[in-house]
Amino acid sequence: LMAAEVIHGGVGAAGALSAQTPQKDVAKIRDGIIYTGMAYEISERCDSISARLFRGINYLQSLRSHARDLGYSEAEIEDYINDDAEKDRLEAIAREQLRLLGVVEGEEATYCAAGRAQIAANTRVGWLLR
């Protein structure tokens, strides 16, 4: 899943109500990373759909800012970004979500159909695509 680089390439993570909460347990951050990865994967696998790059970058930066607002240091954010086990976990979740949307790995038409449906429903994934 090529989304890993986007998922972790510029996004921090954050604690829920305090910096004591594991960063992976903060829904806004975790889900935002997953949605971004799903959108990226669709845009990479479907030639007729592209990622809204500036929107995506701004969204990822807003997640990083949220992490800082919750009290995480840049070092803590970077540690989370570089956590390979967490990256693998989030990729698996993103792949499963795509599968539930009807995506079949290697079948471009299924990525396109899922992407168009997400755009039409104006989901967070769809909001990141055009």
Describe each PLM feature range.
Residues 12-52:
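Immediate post-signal-peptide N-terminus of mature secreted/exported proteins
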Residues 5-6, 21, 67, 102:
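Generic low-complexity, intrinsically disordered sequence content enriched
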Residues 7-8, 17, 71:
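Short intrinsically disordered, low-complexity segments
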Residues 55-130:
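Compact alpha-helical subdomains of small soluble proteins
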Residues 1-10:
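Bacterial N-terminal signal peptides
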Residues 2, 29, 40, 105-106, ...:
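Generic detection of intrinsically disordered/low-complexity segments and helix-coil linkers/edges
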